[in-house]
Amino acid sequence: MPHPTDPVKTPASLLTLIDEGVIDEVVRPLKSGKEAAVYVVRAGNDVRCAKVYKDMAQRSFQKRVQYQEGRKSRGSREARAVATGSRYGRRQQEAEWKNAEVDALYQLRDAGVRVPEPHGFFHGVLVMELVTDAEGFTAPRLGEVELDEAQAREFHAVLVRQVVRMLCCGLIHGDLSAYNVLVGPDGPVVIDFPQVVSAAGNNAARTMLLRDVNNLTASLGRWAPDLLDTWFGEEMWALFEAGELQPDTVLTGQFTFDERTVDLDGVRDAINDARELALIRQQGREEAQYED
């Protein structure tokens, strides 16, 4: 017999949550990506969202290896299984991949980072706050809104501070861009953390941090071009490595490269290329949305 919410092809995991009383209704699909599908759900009088993670077979395994470097397994048996690549190890790695976002949300929320409020993790489904705009509609992504110069500067300052707070928690988003930031009535909200990176344990941590900051700078620099001449990522990473970065550390956006050990022109060219690529990708997304 069909379930009463089946007209929207509700995933079995959400039907389980309905049967267990965690949620009362699946309202509609919100979005579907490579890693997960997100649904608007109702729990009592509250409207929330439920993130249903896709199975390992539907996602890129090799891509996840780089992000998972440095993450702690929950026990020695699990660590050995992951290392040997056994079936149990792959299941354990899958569980760790899903749990990483849940753990990060709680940790970052407690550290003052503006993320969706988590409401629990049930049967592989993350139930959390549905971020809305001032009118109560689903909040747009940062890459979908037009800003004036003052707003762009304000949002950039807010997001740089969020990245600093994440880094002080030992975490790097790993895939941060204008399309992983929602614009709520109180400002930017950072979303999507399944690929969260260990700042101390991942050899690519610095590269990923700089990419995150450069993506934001390239996007917001469209509205406030002088942001493109700032070096917040390099500055905060240097302070982090020196053990001097605090959640409220005042940053200048200026950074002096050591020309004795660094190819300064090469570094600047690489960063500018990354920012240009981020801008090109954003423009491509906007054109695709316009065509749709």
Predicted ranges, named:
Residues 44-55, 61, 132, 138-145, ...:
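Catalytic activation segment of kinase domains across protein kinase-like and atypical kinase folds
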Residues 124, 180-183, 233-239:
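A glycine-rich phosphate-binding loop feature that marks nucleotide/adenosyl-phosphate handling sites
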Residues 3, 7-138, 164, 168:
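Conserved ATP-binding subdomain of kinase catalytic cores across diverse folds
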Residues 168-178:
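Catalytic-loop of the protein kinase fold
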Residues 91-94, 145-152:
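Short, surface-exposed loop/turn motifs that are enriched in glycine and acidic residues
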Residues 95-102, 156, 206, 210-213:
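Amphipathic alpha-helical transducer elements in NTP-driven molecular machines
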Residues 1-29, 150, 154, 158, ...:
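Regulatory N- and C-terminal appendages and interdomain linkers associated
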